[in-house]
Amino acid sequence: MEKHTYLITKLFGYDITVNIPSVITTLITVLLTFIIVMFLTSRIKLRPDSKRQNAAELLAYFISDNVVKGNVNWKKYGKGLWATALTIISFIAIANTIGVLIEVSYDGVVYVNSITADPTFTFSLALLIIVFTHFAGIKYKGVKHYFSTYTSSGIGITPFKVIEEFTNLMTFSMRLFGNIYAGEILLALLATLTTLGFFGAIAGMVGLVVWKGFSLFIGFIQAYIFTVLTFIYLSHKISDEH
């Protein structure tokens, strides 16, 4: 069982536990996301003349066509929310990838791995997204119009709509956590297999290579799914028909 390093501090008189490895990995993920996005979008020209700009434009069209336009009105909301979709999908894709390609540990403590395999992180991220969708709903509809949607179907339905918000939060966070955590568990089992003699080492190494490749694919798919779900929730909050 791997050890973790925690820092306990006080906030408003309450003990707050900070997972140091998660903080380190989050900072690394943010830094890598910033560097990669800046690299892809720097020196943009009207006529693409580099593979880097072609890759950036391909990603831009993919996000706008498959994530944003498919869920919200592009002219009314999409142009202002496009950067949000890019940020979410880039951050989560990189976060998922880090755990597959990199693991930094010392004295039994894992300092760098997939933060999306930490349920606390995915819950916090999902909570941030849910709060953002409510904020967007209030921004585009106004406070009175937005909160009237909770009673428009009858006051008896209101408690169920509130419960739905909590179930969305839990399923949103656990879906990402479950997929990434399961992949890391299997990677750990395959790594253990490499220590069980010659044939175990061969089988374990082959399995690790195959599963790492598959995990990279799953990581990108989960980043895409998380971003699409974000915009589905967002469309429910800002669209007039909801």
Segments from the language model and where they lie:
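Selective transmembrane helix interface/packing segments
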Residues: M1-H242
